[in-house]
């Protein structure tokens, strides 16, 4: 092991450490970071070389953050990334600095985003917040309005998690929805993701995602937002139901097929009579 360590350059060590961090299960970033820190045994190298991994993890996970002085949390996503460690809170029209390692927001300041699309963004946000409140007890959503390739675009992100370390499991739901504002009809493109880690007496992870695309009639802001929520609700319900049904099927068939209920002899061993069996006598004489 020592020989292998000597063969690895600092760059290779950081690359390996970064992969561990990026793939940390939801709610377990600190545990993975501390383990990697012990393995690398070089804090400066880890902080400088793997800083991009800290940021990528938070962006990928839709990490929610509370900004002092503001009631609602905001999600850390690529759509709100303003560069130089600053992020956008479109609801409160502010930008703030975000520490990817400590997961803390500081220095909130006023920020004016795309005013031309703000009425659409606000309508979608109002409808989405009501939906998230109803379906996700711990849910957070952030809605962005921006120009992409010259087209006015709405991007809605949802995150909800349950971290139960004392019960040896953590899980996170994420979904992202995007559509452009075009006359008559547009397409809603969505991606839904579930990640769950269970680690009591074992180590099992569920990592699943689904891509969707549905037509959305475009009229006024409020009505379009209502139709958008119908699409989101239908797709998320269908995905969650499919996951549940698939797990039931796996429980009834796949998992049971992994081992025999009886040994090859088709008979169970009576452990109280083990000494009368041939194997018991052989063990006794050994």
From Swiss-Prot:
Keywords assigned by UniProt, alphabetized: Acetylation, Actin capping, Actin-binding, Phosphoprotein
Modified residues (N-acetylalanine): 2
Gene Ontology process terms (BP): actin cytoskeleton organization; barbed-end actin filament capping
PTM-bearing positions, type Phosphoserine: 9
SUPFAM superfamilies named in the record: Subunits of heterodimeric actin filament capping protein Capz
Gene Ontology CC annotations of this record: brush border; cortical cytoskeleton; F-actin capping protein complex; membrane
Domain of life: Eukaryota
Quaternary assembly: Component of the F-actin capping complex, composed of a heterodimer of an alpha and a beta subunit. Component of the WASH complex, composed of F-actin-capping protein subunit alpha (CAPZA1, CAPZA2 or CAPZA3), F-actin-capping protein subunit beta (CAPZB), WASHC1, WASHC2, WASHC3, WASHC4 and WASHC5. Interacts with RCSD1/CAPZIP.
Name of this protein: F-actin-capping protein subunit alpha-2
Organism: Rhinolophus ferrumequinum
Gene this chain is encoded by: CAPZA2
